[in-house]
Regions:
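N-terminal flexible/basic segments that precede or flank functional cores
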Residues: 1-50, 54, 108
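Short alpha-helical DNA-recognition segment
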Residues: 57-77
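Structural motif corresponding to alpha-helix initiation and N-cap regions
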Residues: 17, 84-87
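Extended, folded domain segments that form the structural surfaces/walls around functional sites
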Residues: 33-35, 75-77, 85
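DNA major-groove recognition helix of helix-turn-helix/homeodomain DNA-binding modules
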Residues: 86-104
Length: 110
């Protein structure tokens, strides 16, 4: 199902579409949102891409495109649920968003 048909179905059912990008106002909120995605689904590349896309839309995709040197179209494509952004793109986008990736030791499953 496409994003458009999903929104049309939600509207027809009386639901108001929720856009998380409208609620990410500070870098702290953006970082917490990204951390939550990484914590809940660390192997979900599409989810990570979509979360970065949500944050980029909150900041303004035109501004992110300008700061990364990438086109808006390529950012929308890469930062979607179907996207598979390169690591270089992820680093450029996180920098443009004022965020930083960091590593921590994972719990060892036994």
């Amino acid at each position: 199902m496409t994003q458009t048909s999903t929104l049309a179905n939600e509207s027809a059912a009386g639901f108001v579409p929720y856009d998380v990008a409208e609620h990410l106002r500070t870098r702290e909120e953006m970082a917490a949102y990204l951390d939550a995605w990484l914590e809940e689904a660390p192997d979900d590349v599409g989810g990570l891409a979509r979360a970065l896309g949500d944050i980029a839309r909150a900041k303004g995709m035109t501004q992110v495109a300008k700061e990364t040197g990438l086109s808006r179209e390529s950012l929308y494509r890469a930062l979607s649920a179907e996207g598979n952004p390169s690591f270089a793109t992820v680093l450029k986008v996180t920098k443009a968003l004022g965020l930083r990736l960091h590593a921590c030791a994972a719990a060892v499953e036994g």
